[in-house]
């Protein structure tokens, strides 16, 4: 079911206005439906039955009201059936006989296969709602219930009956959660929990507000405050309870608690109060632990950066040369030395100089780390107390425990017997140093960096965390995988044996390597120590395209942003999707728009209130809190994209299965703990990673930390879009790794990276393969096919876990990044990824059309980023950037605003082209395909916003009493 169809489900009567697309979708009939219609006697009966069939297909309900029947629909039905449409009054007169109305309703149900819900199906619906209740509010559950009924060919019942089922599901969830809490937590502890959240702190704020607050920065003081929160939660024994309650349920009740002022908590009745408080404290422990680990990782990175800043970038060869010259001068000054002895001394000096190896920069940085460890020792003392876990023995945990024991003794000298070889040979010399105080500092640094690496690859974890749990949590359990593996292999369309998968891939790699060698022989490619590819020539602007663009701009004209939003909403009804129903008033509709604009532009709630005089800043803040919940904005964004792709012009823009993804940095302030310094603009920023279709439009957006690998986010955006099929995703260098290329292929699509570094353009073939001499410098025969075959099942196991939603691609790629080197699954994925990269690069090197295609789709991503920058012109406020869910709302709202602008431009361009086509003025598709829907020149994004709602009331607010009625009323 498409997103745009959802808004029609459950409608009680026909809308006052219906588009041509909707009439064709719902009121066009196939053979069996036509036979049933033509079996009726009389044109009125035929039209009436056709109306019932179309309405049931559109809304899932039976049509019982005939107050409004649009003229266009009545005319369309007549043309569809080839009969003259009579007056609507005759239809109403016919249905005054109840038997006729009932008969037509029953025939419509029979033809479309609908039936009334049975008691068994009602219980199934309650179970479905029970599964969805943790992640949805009441209005969204109402939509899910209607979708479930429609998909199962059940007539959608009255809204009141569905809301009764929703209330029962919510009550059942609350009772089950309350029972589980009461069974695992003693009453005295629950009393302590309830009392603790309402206690006042010395600064006047409640414990509830303090626990929920996000850190301002990643400073030592902020880390200490986060540790203080964890200590408080440990004091309350939160870490000992509620381990069996799912994370989604914890999140639901925690967010419900913080949505109200702390003073309102006393008014909440039991067991709801206990459920909310318990889930809130447990969820706070999860999020605070994640914050601590991220801040510690950032602090360690800062420690390395500060040490590296004091070390010269390269070896000072000039100083070494001067030293050698000085020694030579000293020898030559000794005139009394015989020539033979002088020659021997010179040879010895040269030999000694050649053996003298300057220290590497990394070793100098490590020495600087050892010297500078004291300022972060208190941090190491604190994190040593946390309950770190590992599968089996792990050196990071072992030596963290030894350091903790030494801290408790107050000792700052390392015992002689501690040499810590398992922490790595690079630290061995420093830890074995005779200076045991310095050896102690070296052990601290080695343990700190070993812990950082282990947390990144998932070999060490903390159980009460959302993002840093063990790597085993990424996979299905072994029992489940053994039972369901065949189903997942089939779902991923993968063979059970790696050899079957590798055979066509190896043939493609061999053919690709031969093609690259042929291109090198012909001079198309230049190979020395690296492979050099000539840049594609820039495309010249076609004068006909410029002329067409100017003509379209002239016909479309200028418009205000409110007009654009209303025009798109009238077609898509994204406000209905966000609300889960029709807006009840104009003010509620404006609050939806204000919530989108306050998140999707740099306007604050106060500034939005100035631009929308009908609303207050308080109501806009309320709309912002509501809009960012439960991914409402992303659902609306998806619906607008579907509307945009329906236009015929979209087919001229490119392929439907090709997309690109890229990150855009958004400036913020230093008082945001997840902000990183943008290397280009040297400002604190947060990244927003967006996926753009080749046919334009954003289909996924996600906030991301700058300077991190983006491959996981790139993959996540594709696999979470079930309605869009993407076979190739173009990314830049930061959006790929070898493991990510193999993971993406197992998930059903190809990563196509535009590689910046020449070293990344090397080709790889299996061991023992003969490499053509022309490309021997850039082709390595070191791929271990046997390793891929050995761990094939584990690679598919991980892909199936990600595809099913058991784990996210972001988490999987974070655990299987460079920190996982040496892990057999990681190494197998890298080997497979190198083969896939070779096959891709071979096409990229020799096929200019393929290169042009990737350049085009990546440029479209950049153009969309430019559009988003024009919409969001300022900084992201600290209030919106401190929590992931708030940043997700910014990303989704900005994508929605950009999609609205592109959808409006698309519809206007299509309307102009249709008018020209009606006048037999045909425009070649190759010219239309070069006109982008990202124009902003004629759209005013600023000023006082006046929304002409009355102009679009028939489509957006059809049930409003004072809305003008369009259509035929008899």
UniProtKB/Swiss-Prot annotation:
GO terms for biological process: DNA transposition. GO terms for molecular function: DNA binding; transposase activity. Transmembrane segments: none annotated. It holds the Pfam family DDE_Tnp_Tn3. Keywords: DNA recombination, DNA-binding, Transposable element, Transposition. Belongs to the transposase 7 family. Required for transposition of transposon Tn5271. This is Transposase for insertion sequence element IS1071 in transposon Tn5271. It comes from Comamonas testosteroni.
